[in-house]
Regions:
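Structural/interface elements that position substrates and couple domains in central-metabolism enzymes
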Residues: 1-206
Length: 206
């Protein structure tokens, strides 16, 4: 909704977090949730409720919303690239479902990357944990051993995971393609600073 009406989700999160009944700790915009807990636990709760003929409509809607999140992000990527994906060099920085883990279970990139490949994109990624087993069988996917190599020839750089390693990258110095774009799925950068550097920057919810 914020993207539709040109409102910054970070401002909304700060405002909501001021309510002590809500708090701001978990109000972070981003891709779909994943890992070993949320996906399994939400489904287990719904299944248990069904056995006792109880309809947990809110939790069901959360599960469905999370399923749709990756497809919405994919549409955003297509929009950023003006629908021209074939032969575009797209770099994913981070592929785990969150930072400080090597867990890729239900990571949104597991849906996005194969979809982009089908559309002809050339995918490259860097993952601080060195994780690459999931993509070994995919064509047009390469793994870089460092950030500089990963991003230097990119048309689009996607910040998929909020690793601290990614927060101080000098994109202007490293990326050769002067018309490169950044899609920050974790909002780890200041949009104002990016615009000041004349970088084509796109964030979640803004």
């Amino acid at each position: 909704l914020c993207e539709k009406i040109d409102v910054n989700i970070e401002d909304i999160s700060i405002g909501m977090g001021l309510d002590k009944r809500i708090g701001g700790r978990f109000l972070r915009a981003g891709p779909a949730y994943g890992g070993s807990c949320f996906p399994k636990d939400t489904k287990a709760i719904v299944t248990t409720a069904a056995k006792f003929k109880t309809n947990l409509s809110i939790i069901k809607s959360v599960i469905n919303s999370n399923k749709n999140r990756s497809s919405l992000l994919l549409k955003r990527v297509l929009k950023i690239l003006n629908g021209k994906v074939k032969n575009k060099k797209i770099c994913f920085l981070g592929v785990t479902f969150k930072a400080n883990t090597d867990d890729m279970r239900d990571s949104s990139c597991l849906t996005m990357i194969p979809s982009l490949i089908k559309k002809g994109a050339l995918i490259n990624y860097f993952e601080p944990t060195g994780k690459k087993e999931e993509f070994k069988k995919l064509v047009n996917v390469s793994f870089s051993k460092n950030i500089n190599t990963a991003i230097k020839n990119s048309d689009l750089i996607i910040i998929h995971t909020e690793w601290n390693d990614f927060k101080s990258i000098n994109f202007k110095k490293i990326v050769k393609n002067k018309r490169f774009k950044i899609f920050d799925m974790r909002n780890i950068y200041s949009a104002k600073k990016m615009y000041k550097q004349k970088i084509n920057y796109y964030a979640i919810g803004g």
